[in-house]
Structure formats: C-alpha cells, structure tokens
C-alpha cells in the first residue's frame, strides 16, 4: 500500500465535487489531499486527490468514479509521467539572530519570505511533498512553527 494520486476531470456543475467526495466517504476511502479548480475549458473542473491504497483499490475507485454522471476521465498520476507540486505557507517565530539562517535556508529551497516582523516570518514555498516536509523538519529544529497551511497536490502531464 502506498500514496496514490488521482486526477479526475468532471463537468463543472453544482454538486459534482460533493458526489466524488461522497463516493470516497461511502466506500471508506480516506482523502489525504484534495485540490479543485476549473481547467482551460471553464465547463470542466480538475480534481486532484491523494489517497492511500494498493493498485487494486485504486482501480476499484476509478471504476466507481466513472459511474458518476459528471465524471469525464480518471487518471492515476504516475511519478515519472507527471510534474507534481504543492504550495505551502508557514508562519514561524524566529529571533533576530535566527532570521538570517531562516532566509538562507528558505532561499536554498527556492522559497520567499513574504512577511517579516521582529519575531514572526511568513514563508511561501512550492515543491514536492518530500521537499516541503524536509523544510518543515529543518524549521522545527531551528525555530518555533506557529502555523502551516498547505494547498494539496496539483499535477500536470510532462509531455
């Protein structure tokens, strides 16, 4: 069993998202991350869901999703075929002496300090789940994390 990511294209209609989430809930599948937004065709939305299961479970979820009237296409996101990213905002309590180190680490992760006061910094990062988790672990050792807000995974096909 491992983390799996599904990309679902569906009609951008009232209740469509609710039916997809309801299917997961009714079947006892956990949603670890979900993002939803219209595509370039505003009548179609893309849902990206991260869940946990083996290949057989994911195939079953896909078959059940295809039965929903609004669902147009379901694709499992494979690592080698897609770019995957997530956005994170993190608020930390740091001293003046820690600020320079926070700035250097944030730059190394290609992040931005979007707000800073004498003892609070808010940082924006984008990257893979692993990349963001690594940044969090480094900040836990260096500062006091006040709050974290993560967007959930988004993806796009490489070719």
Curated annotation (Swiss-Prot):
Domain spans labelled ACT: 5-79
GO molecular function ontology, one term from the record:
acetolactate synthase activity
Q: Which residues form a coiled coil?
A: none
Keywords associated with the record: Amino-acid biosynthesis, Branched-chain amino acid biosynthesis, Transferase
List GO BP terms, alphabetically. Answer: isoleucine biosynthetic process; L-valine biosynthetic process
Concerning SUPFAM superfamilies, the annotation shows:
ACT-like
Question: Which reactions does this protein catalyse?
Answer: 2 pyruvate + H(+) = (2S)-2-acetolactate + CO2
InterPro entries reported in the protein's UniProt record: Acetalactate_synth_ssu, Acetolactate_synth/TF_NikR_C, Acetolactate_synth_ssu_C, ACT-like_dom_sf, ACT_dom, AHAS_ACT, AHAS_small-like_ACT
Which pathway is it part of? Amino-acid biosynthesis; L-isoleucine biosynthesis; L-isoleucine from 2-oxobutanoate: step 1/4; Amino-acid biosynthesis; L-valine biosynthesis; L-valine from pyruvate: step 1/4
Asked if the keyword Lyase belongs to this entry, the reply reads: no
Q: Which family does it belong to?
A: Belongs to the acetolactate synthase small subunit family.
Q: What is the protein's name according to its record?
A: Acetolactate synthase small subunit
Annotated organism of origin? Buchnera aphidicola subsp. Baizongia pistaciae (strain Bp)
Q: Which gene encodes it?
A: ilvH
């Amino acid at each position: 069993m491992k983390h799996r990511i599904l990309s679902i294209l569906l009609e951008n209609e009232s209740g469509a998202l609710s039916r997809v989430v309801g299917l997961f809930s009714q079947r006892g599948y956990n949603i670890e991350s979900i993002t939803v937004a219209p595509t370039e065709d505003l009548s179609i939305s893309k849902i990206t869901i991260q869940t946990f299961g083996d290949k057989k479970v994911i195939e079953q979820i896909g078959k059940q999703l295809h039965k929903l009237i609004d669902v147009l296409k379901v694709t499992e996101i494979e690592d080698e075929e897609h770019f995957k990213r997530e956005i994170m905002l993190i608020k930390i309590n740091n001293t003046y002496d820690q600020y320079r180190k926070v700035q250097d680490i944030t730059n190394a992760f290609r992040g931005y300090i979007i707000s800073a006061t004498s003892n609070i910094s808010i940082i924006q990062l984008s990257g893979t789940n692993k990349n963001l988790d690594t940044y969090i672990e480094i900040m836990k050792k260096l500062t006091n994390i006040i709050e974290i807000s993560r967007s959930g995974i988004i993806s796009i096909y490489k070719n």
